[in-house]
């Protein structure tokens, strides 16, 4: 075992070098979960007053009354899908369901699925950030109640243009959100209705390292960047029944039924200088894993040559009055960021369904805690 005064081990040196290389691709600062107003209102990153920043908008349309009951899939487009699939199998214990030479489908335990779809640099559906070779192009959720004609009618009534996508017993519609993001709404007879069928399917790519033995137990949060977070939060709340936690002034964490959470973050419509980005994009995903031990998880990442960046998202005032990041061992939210083979910002945390609001509580501005 190295002494405290020893230099980094060979695995730590590899991780450090990898971080240095990834910094050139924009991974020098993880996409953290706190909003711009965590440290207060009417200040540099959050110039509006609390009253204006958190002011409600008129709902984008009337609620459908639907409830989201399952995650059907999250679709990634990337330039080496088999390396990515093998990485998640080894790191997070996902199971390969299928691989047809063009894409791989993996199950996340018994509660979710991902699609890794092979593309070339010139045919991404959603352009990836500069230097990256991977992007999330859409997500799909199961809703109830389901009646095909009624679902289509309700979508059309709200000005959406549903595009049917049916395969076997799966019935679904694709619609576009306010930023043009692809949302698939399903009946539950697709991936969600047939999980556990991955037995006997072998990876075409060798595992990049020894399996960690971890299990992915929870969709901690999806970090979803949009042009107008209030508008998007209203869209998903009223369309799919997602429950808002609180409006922070730059983001709103929504509870996706019993599935997990999503951080809808972006421009505030009451800020005159708000800039319009290219459209919605998903900058990182955080998965809750088990078992969790702060030091053991970090060591497991480092020994596999992976970059590691701690993220508590919470902070406290230091002696000089400036905010200091909370120590991960005592923080209410414990997590690490790392990077996948194709350059995606992957976050793993200790979050479970039972403590799903720990992050939202930890980063809630003090002004919102006041009566």
Residues of each region from the PLM?
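N-terminal secretory signal peptides
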Residues: 1-11, 24
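Vicinal oxygen chelate
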Residues: 15-64, 69-80, 104-107, 126-217, 224, 298-371, ...
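Short beta-strand/turn micro-motifs at beta-sheet edges
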Residues: 60-64, 124-129, 208-211, 270-275
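Core segments of cupin and vicinal oxygen chelate
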Residues: 75-120, 165, 171-174, 223-270, ...
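Non-catalytic surface loops within mature trypsin-like serine protease
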Residues: 78-80, 110, 120, 143-145, ...
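Structured segments of extracytoplasmic/periplasmic soluble domains
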Residues: 84, 90-95, 142, 154, ...
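A short local loop/turn or secondary-structure capping micro-motif enriched for an aromatic residue
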Residues: 114-116, 122-126, 191-194, 263, ...
């Amino acid at each position: 075992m190295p002494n405290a005064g020893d230099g980094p081990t060979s695995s730590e040196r590899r991780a450090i070098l990898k971080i240095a290389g990834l910094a050139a691709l924009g991974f020098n600062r993880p996409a953290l979960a706190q909003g711009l107003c965590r440290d207060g209102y009417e200040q540099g990153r959050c110039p509006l007053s609390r009253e204006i920043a958190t002011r409600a908008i008129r709902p984008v349309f009337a609620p459908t009354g639907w409830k989201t009951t399952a995650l059907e899939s999250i679709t990634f487009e990337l330039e080496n899908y088999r390396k990515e699939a093998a990485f998640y199998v080894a790191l997070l214990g996902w199971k390969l369901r299928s691989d047809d030479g063009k894409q791989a489908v993996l199950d996340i335990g018994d509660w979710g699925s991902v699609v890794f779809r092979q593309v070339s640099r010139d045919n991404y559906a959603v352009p990836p950030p500069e230097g990256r070779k991977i992007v999330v192009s859409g997500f799909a959720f199961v809703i109830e109640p389901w009646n095909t004609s009624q679902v289509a009618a309700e979508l059309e009534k709200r000005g959406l243009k549903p595009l049917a996508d049916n395969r076997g017993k799966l019935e679904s519609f694709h619609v576009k959100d306010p930023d043009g993001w692809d949302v698939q709404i399903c009946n539950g007879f697709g991936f969600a209705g047939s999980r556990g069928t991955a037995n006997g399917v072998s990876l075409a790519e060798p595992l990049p390292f020894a399996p960690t033995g971890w299990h992915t137990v929870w969709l901690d949060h999806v970090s979803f960047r949009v042009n107008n977070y209030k508008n998007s939060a209203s869209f998903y709340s009223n369309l799919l029944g997602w429950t808002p936690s609180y409006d922070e002034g730059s983001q709103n964490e929504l509870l996706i039924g019993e599935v997990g959470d999503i951080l809808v973050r972006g421009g505030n419509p009451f800020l005159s200088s708000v800039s319009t980005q290219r459209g919605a994009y998903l900058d990182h995903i955080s998965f809750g894993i088990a078992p969790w031990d702060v030091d053991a998880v970090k060591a497991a990442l480092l020994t596999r040559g992976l970059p590691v960046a701690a993220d508590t998202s919470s902070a406290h005032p230091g002696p000089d009055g400036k905010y200091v990041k909370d120590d991960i061992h005592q923080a209410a939210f414990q997590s690490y960021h790392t990077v996948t083979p194709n350059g995606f910002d992957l976050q793993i945390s200790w979050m479970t369904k039972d403590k799903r609001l720990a992050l939202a509580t930890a980063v809630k501005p003090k002004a919102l805690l006041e009566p």
